[in-house]
Amino acid sequence: MTMPSTQFHTTILEQFSLFLSVDRGLCQQSIAAYRQDISSFLTISAISSPQDISQNSVYIFAEELYRRKEAETTLARRLIALKVFFLFLKDQQLLPYPPIIEHPKIWKRLPSVLTPQEVDALLAVPLQMEKNPRHLAFRDTAILHTLYSTGVRVSELCDLRLGHVSDDCIRVTGKGSKTRLVPLGSRAREAIDAYLCPFRDQYQKKNPHEDHLFLSTRGHKLERSCVWRRIHNYAKQVTSKPVSPHSLRHAFATHLLDNKADLRVIQEMLGHARIASTEVYTHVAADSLIEKFLAHHPRNL
């Protein structure tokens, strides 16, 4: 008896999610993204069992994505998810001969990096804004300093707990639940101390058992969306570049490379599983070097 397509979708997506969590060690956010992509594939290509999956079903899916004029990066992400899904089906002996996935060629965009001067200006903004309440100014200054000093992802920042912070380093839990120690600069440590007492103490009175480092004014763990929104607003005061919390991670890595830091050390601090993810910053640093050369070489003046 053939299983109804909706029941098949639900069952196979649950099994796939378990595979991503246990075998691949992915976080819930990544698993949700994979589920969404595969759910789209199953629906668009009218898949009601593994036997329905063929090269043609992949073409149907890809054509629909092209018809929707999805961005190249989105298209590539969906096809990568499809490739992982097929590997899962093969591993479960549900699809012995998976279709071939051809990835579209993508121009890998280099991140637009803040200069050290722009970072310094950004770090100073919260305390300079007259209408910014002092408790928010000190909290947000500590957030900005921590992001730039350590290069952590905004999700990792929000997950930091009081016990994860010492005088000269922080303990970070990154992708795949992997833990790493990252040095904490003295200016960042000073900014955190200035926030902890009295401002964080005031927040915690509303929620005494909360032990996350960065709290909302109601005493709860700070949400990533809040960090993104506040940094975006601060950045508008000092630069026309698009700035997000990840911009400070880019700046952290690029400025370290500019100052001759070892690429492998940067890889460890960023929590990259592959060195290729870190190598993108060598291209950013090289572009910066070329710009300086063109600006200062006598033949170009």
Curated annotation (Swiss-Prot):
Active-site residues from the entry: R153, K175, H246, R249, H272, Y281 (o-(3'-phospho-dna)-tyrosine intermediate)
Assigned protein family: Belongs to the 'phage' integrase family. XerD subfamily.
CDD domains: INT_XerDC_C
Subunit note: Forms a cyclic heterotetrameric complex composed of two molecules of XerC and two molecules of XerD.
Function: Site-specific tyrosine recombinase, which acts by catalyzing the cutting and rejoining of the recombining DNA molecules. The XerC-XerD complex is essential to convert dimers of the bacterial chromosome into monomers to permit their segregation at cell division. It also contributes to the segregational stability of plasmids.
Source organism: Chlamydia pneumoniae (Chlamydophila pneumoniae)
Protein name: Tyrosine recombinase XerD
GO molecular function, one term: DNA binding
